[in-house]
Amino acid sequence: MMVYSEAGGVSKTTAAVSVAMTAAEAGHRTVLIDLDPRAASTKWTRIAPVGEGLHVGAILGAKEEPTGWAEDLAVQSTWHPLLRVIPSARDLSNRESDRDDYAELRLKTSLVDLQADVVVIDCANRQGGPLTLSALHAADRVLYAATASDSGVDGVTGAQRTVDTFRRSMARLGAAATIEEAGVAMTRDGTGFLSYAEQDAIDQVRELAPIIEPIVPHLAIVPEVRMAGEWYGAYRKGAPIRDAYTEVMRKVIR
């Protein structure tokens, strides 16, 4: 499953990491793939590649067929024994200029024989391009991430447009696009009453795609633990967020 928005600052990485971690806590063997050159998931989970340059960019830039490489590059997380991470790096951006034939299929090919029940892809906030295409080919579902804001609405709108374009392109080729929309993981500030602007944004997003309840509160502990490389669910103050994402995870993970 890919977690996607075309806007920045809409809790996309928080959603991806949270769904992956709560899936592991629920007993699923989980692999989180950081497909964003910002490497936010990688930095948060404090994951280092198994060797120099052996991050997700090695898969996307492979000159030979990378069958099964994901299993080799997935690194065990210290957060949970059932969570592994395929890290990213800034030079992943070099892959965005890659025009090799079938380059967009390398990530999907690498997942062959991966020992995992759940794969979560933290996507870059791109309007298409090789990184997004790689995720679209590899994933069977897309979970949109949004905040209750104008940026959240714009991010979902753009992401849906990209997914629709991908589906139409596959149809023109006579190939089935298997990716489905799982819905929207929605975040809002705090736990108090919704402001008019927040409610308006939520209503606009709901017209685009189903919002997966509950709406997740964004609390100060999230940026604090991200700086420390820790899981907010290990702290009492993080319980409301963990519980909300656990419910979201149960609704989107098959």
Regions found by a protein language model. Give the residues of each.
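P-loop NTP-binding core
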Residues: M1-R254
